[in-house]
């Protein structure tokens, strides 16, 4: 379990937005990074606190990188002291952290936003200080007042970070013609390739692994580890939205099958015997379901947007 504090204009809408994101466990609203230790809603202009949402999330379900990408989806990162119709220092944008270990992920996302926009953004990145929980009537405001004021579209939380429409599944005829016999049997008929002799069991180059049927990105190489099981093993997908999970009772066992989102290709299974320091999961994946894209090939192959996150 981890937490981050995000300022992005009126906190009513921002809290409702984050509460809808899979992997977010709890939200609350408050006032952060003012000049003094106490404040209230009426005193914000005097104390210089920012309206802020506390986001508590399950790192196994959603990463800080994903949380921040959702954040940038609904703010104007170039606007100074204004979001929507709300003006004033209390409506400034900010990312406030408690754990300095979060800084690499924060700076990576911020720098990528600046690269895309071509200029420095107005979002402040600071250690959390002087955080005050807001009054009760502000907590879960839009849940209690569904028609209340909101400056953002909270349904943006339902839109995936990686658009499945960009990775359309080919027809069975095309798949049969384009895939090897083994890749077809594994992805379309849920077969299992032989351990230890497959293509990527011992591959640890920088890059990403994509669905061999659609090209949809699935795993970062940085999340691959040597499990000794004979198949490629990953601690997590690039985003959990890219994977679909199914109960598998075949062969007298109870397992969780994993399939790709867009192609519904059989990938393998996920187990709970992975390294604890990596989150405890082991995605055991058939090489025949994957295509590896090396770091120096990613831009040309259309995956340049993922380059900033390879090592973070």
Swiss-Prot record:
UniProt keyword annotations, A-Z: Cell membrane, Membrane, Multifunctional enzyme, Oxidoreductase
SUPFAM superfamilies, sorted: Mss4-like, Peptide methionine sulfoxide reductase
InterPro entries tied to this protein: Met_Sox_Rdtase_MsrA_dom, Met_Sox_Rdtase_MsrA_sf, Met_Sox_Rdtase_MsrB, Met_Sox_Rdtase_MsrB_dom, Mss4-like_sf
Domain MsrB, residue spans: 172-295
Record membrane topology: Peripheral membrane protein
Gene3D superfamilies in the record: Peptide methionine sulfoxide reductase, Peptide methionine sulphoxide reductase MsrA
Reaction equation(s) it catalyzes: L-methionyl-[protein] + [thioredoxin]-disulfide + H2O = L-methionyl-(S)-S-oxide-[protein] + [thioredoxin]-dithiol; [thioredoxin]-disulfide + L-methionine + H2O = L-methionine (S)-S-oxide + [thioredoxin]-dithiol; L-methionyl-[protein] + [thioredoxin]-disulfide + H2O = L-methionyl-(R)-S-oxide-[protein] + [thioredoxin]-dithiol
GO function term, MF aspect, one: L-methionine:thioredoxin-disulfide S-oxidoreductase activity
Source taxon at top rank: Bacteria
Keyword Cell membrane in annotation: yes
Localisation per UniProt entry: Cell membrane
Location of region: Peptide methionine sulfoxide reductase: 1-155
Catalytic site: 10, 284
NCBIfam families, sorted: msrA, peptide-methionine (R)-S-oxide reductase MsrB
Protein family according to the UniProt entry: In the N-terminal section; belongs to the MsrA Met sulfoxide reductase family.
Protein name per UniProt: Peptide methionine sulfoxide reductase MsrA/MsrB 1
Organism: Streptococcus pneumoniae serotype 4 (strain ATCC BAA-334 / TIGR4)
Lineage: Bacteria, Bacillati, Bacillota, Bacilli, Lactobacillales
Gene: msrAB1
